[in-house]
Swiss-Prot record:
Organism, scientific name: Albidiferax ferrireducens (strain ATCC BAA-621 / DSM 15236 / T118) (Rhodoferax ferrireducens)
NCBIfam families: 3a0107s01c2 (TIGR00972)
Subcellular compartments: Cell inner membrane
Reaction catalyzed: phosphate(out) + ATP + H2O = ADP + 2 phosphate(in) + H(+)
CDD domains: ABC_PstB_phosphate_transporter
Domain of life: Bacteria
A biological process term (GO) from this entry: phosphate ion transmembrane transport
Enzyme Commission no: 7.3.2.1
Subunit structure as annotated in this protein's UniProt entry: The complex is composed of two ATP-binding proteins (PstB), two transmembrane proteins (PstC and PstA) and a solute-binding protein (PstS).
SMART domains: AAA (SM00382)
Principal subcellular localization: membrane
Protein name, as recorded: Phosphate import ATP-binding protein PstB
UniProt record similarity statement: Belongs to the ABC transporter superfamily. Phosphate importer (TC 3.A.1.7) family.
Length: 259
């Protein structure tokens, strides 16, 4: 397919002719698209279409599994992440990820946030405390945990744990934040808080979200990509994708006739 371009501005992430394999299985086929900076881009599509796989390629999580490989280009500010010789840990500091299930570390709320910061920066105690508070405020969690920072992160509710994970991700000040179905295990109230947070975060970060909830994609995202069986079927402004899709396959999925 041709490269999907949605804006004339320079993209934060440019994917060019990306193919991905699980062993011999061809999971992503010739994906090309440009993800705009300081916007929320949502990936939708049926289970197994390649949404989460693509997300994991963005910060090379797949390299943890030797049978998986990627071919093509993923450019972050013009640098191909797939061939970069930089430390992968530094890459993942720039391209943070929050997973479907909340994964607080087995440590205090404070240390959950401070852990990553200590890996990449040498801050004095005051600056570290300020960074932790800043991240928790950004994640709309400070007011709920400021008096119990020494308690275990696992003591929080599911929605609070997910916001803790988001705070942990942004504490190291990444440029891109990847969210893999961040609300799938949460109740409606917690989901609403996460959605509000996603909308606010784009002022500081480029946000990419995978979701099965099409209403969530419509509410939160500026751009939407529809994927099916490893192919990028359509990519454009969210309003256009939902109300004036150019492909029948996209319309069928969004209207519930397929999926």
């Amino acid at each position: 397919m041709n490269t999907a371009v949605v804006t004339n501005a320079a993209p934060k992430i440019a994917v060019k002719n990306l193919n991905f394999f699980y062993g011999k299985f061809h999971a992503l086929r010739d994906i090309s698209l440009e993800i705009p900076e300081h916007k929320v881009t949502a990936f939708i599509g049926p289970s197994g279409c390649g949404k989460s796989t693509l997300l994991r390629v963005f910060n090379r999580m797949f390299e943890l599994y030797p049978e998986q490989r990627a071919e093509g280009e993923i450019l972050l500010d013009g640098e191909n992440l797939l061939t970069s010789k930089k430390d992968v840990a530094l890459l993942r500091a720039k391209v943070g990820m929050v997973f479907q299930k909340p994964t607080p570390f087995p440590m205090s709320i404070f240390d959950n946030i401070a852990f990553g910061v200590k890996l990449f920066e040498s801050l004095n105690t005051t600056d570290l405390e300020e960074r932790v508070e800043w991240a928790l405020r950004k994640a709309a969690l400070w007011g709920e945990v400021k008096d119990k920072l020494t308690q275990s992160g696992s003591s929080l509710s599911g929605g609070q744990q997910q916001r803790l994970c988001i705070a942990r991700g942004i504490a190291i000040k990444p440029e891109v934040l990847l969210l893999d179905e961040p609300c799938s295990a949460l109740d409606p109230i917690s989901t609403g808080k996460i959605e509000e947070l996603i909308t606010e975060l784009k002022s500081d970060y480029t946000v990419v979200i995978v979701t099965h909830n099409m209403q969530q994609a419509a509410r939160c995202s500026d751009y939407t990509a529809y994927m099916y069986l490893g192919d990028l079927m359509e990519f454009g402004a969210t309003e256009q994708i939902f109300f004036k899709p150019t492909r029948k396959e996209t319309e069928d999925y969004i209207t519930g006739r397929f999926g």
